[in-house]
């Protein structure tokens, strides 16, 4: 790690184990910043503003008792791609390990009104930049400095206001483990932030998700963000990563120019702007007897593969139920997204209705999932054998043709019949019959099946009655 001596303003390099205590300076970049080459070769022509920032940063760090300062403009050789990649992948940890973080707000005057919802502090550019998100979250304390380098206050003092400005819950600003925030929630924190380089809107989030990946400048925002999501899914099964909405006018699925945008993965953190209140559900929607067949997310040359329960709808559409809900509604609802079959022979799907996702009460989920692929009407008999074959689920958002598979299978073996809204529907094929929904008492500590003649399936709260599994291959 490379640090600046606050007394001599020269560079010094340290191995990780030997790194001394240091302060760190967070700021927004402007023209004329001092670079590593400038400091190493003592070049200051035309860099007066950059050197003033360096000089003042060293002074406030020294006044706080630190012999060393880390400043990104000077401490990273950005002409060295290997060093740059290593630095960006390590930056969250460097901010976390700093003894103190000073945030210099160049657009906030010292004589400004006290920080409030509509003050220069709240409107500072610092709160709109991608890189400053981790610089706010990683350090245990952040001292905010006005444009004359006088102290405005600190993160712990302004925590309620900063939570309103950023949409980040106070607990996470004060050091709560970021792993306790859902993927959708964390991505929403970056939804209104900007970076100079398009790819950096993904790279600036590596530390937020404890992810490391190579930097590929030139892949554009969508490519970088797709790779970030893929890396996240390798270590997490949080399905809120699919709970995003796309702004803009709706595009018909028959519009060939829009096909490449109908992806299961978002193209930008901006799509999570309205997902800040979505949390991962504590208990899976899928009942215990199906947990064993839930496949992990797997990537191959066709895209990604995962298992989701679905509800069959008309017009070749299905609702894919995600194991997430609005905050405080984990026992009441689930988020679902729309998929649509766009193939001629059935089974190839894309994400549709991207401007919304559905909030489905669990009671509705139970009953709807029970009949998702039965299609019984007017009490007529239905042969379920036609649902046994696999179909293909396509996500055309991939650069090639992403493919998904839809398998209504793993039905519960049983005998007898079941009841829906007072009607009895007989089964000619006893091999694939189902359970009725369980009734939960107010304490949610017991569940009672409504059907006789079952095979002794363990009673569980939130039991799915009958399941179709959407094994979704999809790419961004």
Model-derived features with residue positions:
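A structural "flexibility-hinge" signal
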Residues: 1-18, 27-64, 79-82, 88-93, ...
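Active-/binding-site microenvironments in catalytic and ligand-binding cores
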Residues: 24
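Short acidic/polar active-site loop segments enriched in Thr and Asp
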Residues: 67-69, 101
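Conserved hydrophobic ligand-interaction patch in extracellular adhesion modules
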Residues: 69-77
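Acidic beta-strand-to-loop metal/phosphate-binding motif
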Residues: 74, 104-106
